[in-house]
Structures are given as structure tokens and as C-alpha cells.
Amino acid sequence: MFARLGVAILLVIFSANLSWANHVLFVVGPDSHGPGSHEPIAGARLLKHCIENLPKLTGHTAEVVSKWPNESQQAKADTVVFLGDTFPANRFEDAARNLADLHRMMQRGCGIVCLHYATGLKKEDVSPTGEHPLLGWMGGYFANPGSTHHVSYARVFDKAKITPGKAKHPILRGWKEFVIRDEPYGNNYFGPHDNKPAPNVTILATSLQPPESPKREAVAWCVQRADKGRGFGIVMPHYYKNWSHDDLRTFVLNGILWTANITLPQAGVKCPAPDLKSFGPKSVEAR
């Protein structure tokens, strides 16, 4: 009897450990920016390092690819994180196939994250009224200049103040309002109803911009989808060196792991400040 009980306890522990290990897939698309700006490959490597070396959330794994992921990589992912010049699924060869792959991933509850310019969609990517699957999967997007249904804007601000949203949400744990020199996109697109976010979308952070005509702009958001999947979009960082900012790094890591259905610590996801040079950027400083 006691032997059977012991085996049962071990099985429960083993099962719990299995369910605790989640996998994050980073997909890096094309990039045309100069050294120190965007640096999507280095940024993905840095985030992978953080996820695999978290002191209080152990066992999680991550992978970085710079081409469209194969079926095995897609199937393994609990969430997929995109970096690059606009939404990589539309930039890699055979966008229709890529979007179909993502549709299947989303249907099974996979998460999706886009960082900075990967939140962007071009005029040719969307319908004349702005329809695109990313709007439902992630809750909003950056409408690239040239779009006809809506136009977002990109501008570097020397002192952009990033203010946490008012909602109580796990992604808001462990970081506070901060000021940063970056390019937090404004007038992002959330849908055809006066650009108001859908009911299942939470605005996570805002920034009052531009200085000469301030308006509170949503710069990060998340969605809890009906398919049980989750999405997270944040329109920073433009500068690679900003990954050294503790509050920004916690904010982004919170968002990524939340979309992978990982329970976040009350103090947020804390990754010690990494050595930015070690992840192979063309430059740490923009030039």
C-alpha cells in the first residue's frame, strides 16, 4: 500500500514538473536597421538566455530561428515571439502558408508576441479596412506609414515616460513607471470601432506623446483569446542598449511568459542585467 502511495506521489510530482516546462520560440525576420538599432537576432538571443536562466522559474526552454519554423518547431512552441522589420510571417516567403501555420498554432492555444517593429503591418498585408489575423491573435498592431485605413507613427523621444496601465494584470508585476530614450510607436491600431480595443484586450502601458501635442498613447497591450491562447504586443525597444533597463526587461519577459501560460511571480520575472555584447549585436550603441 505504502509503495503504491509512494509511486503515486512520484507520478504527481513528475507530471507537475512536465507541465511546468514550457517552450518559447523566437522567430527573427529580416532587418534593415543600422548597428545598435533593433538588433533582432541579438535581442532574441538575450531573451532566450534570460528565459533559460531565471532563478525562480527554472526548466523553461527557448529557441531562436531566423527563418520560418518547421512543423516540429511550431508544434513544440507554447508561445512564438516575433522580431524584425514588420510582422515576419508576412515578410518570409509564402505568407499565405505562414499565416495558415500560425492559424493552426493559435487554434491549439499557442501564444503570440510581437516586439517593436514586428508589431507592424504594411498596406499590402491588410485588407482595405485593415483586417488581418494578427489583430485578433494579438489585439492590435502598428499600421505602417502608407496604410489607407489607419496610420500609426514612429518617432524617437528622448524622455518617453512609460506608465503602467490601470488594470490589475500579471504582466504589470514587478516593474514601475520609467523614462527611456526610445521609439514607442503612437496611434497603434486596435480595430474598426473608433480604434477602441476589443473587450478582451487590456492596455498594459501608455505614453503621453508627442510633447508638442500630448495624447495618451497605448504602447503595450495583451489579449486573452477565445481559443484559450494569449497575445502580447509592445512597441519597444528600438535601441538594443535598452535591454539593459531592468523595468523594460521585466515588462517584456512578463509578457512573453504570460503568453506561454506560465504563472508569473508576484514580483515579476527578474533576469539579472545581461552582458549586451555577449549576444553578438553589430553594436551595443546606435550608430
Annotate each PLM feature.
Residues 149-228:
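Catalytic beta-strand/loop cores that center a nucleophilic Ser/Cys/Thr
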Residues 1-3:
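N-terminal secretory signal peptides that target proteins for export/translocation
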Residues 5-17:
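Bacterial N-terminal signal peptides
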Residues 19-21:
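Boundary at the C-terminal end of the N-terminal hydrophobic targeting segment
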Residues 25-27, 31-122:
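Helical hinge/lid and interdomain linker segments adjacent to catalytic or ligand-binding clefts
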Residues 32-33, 155-159, 176, 209, ...:
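Active-site rim elements
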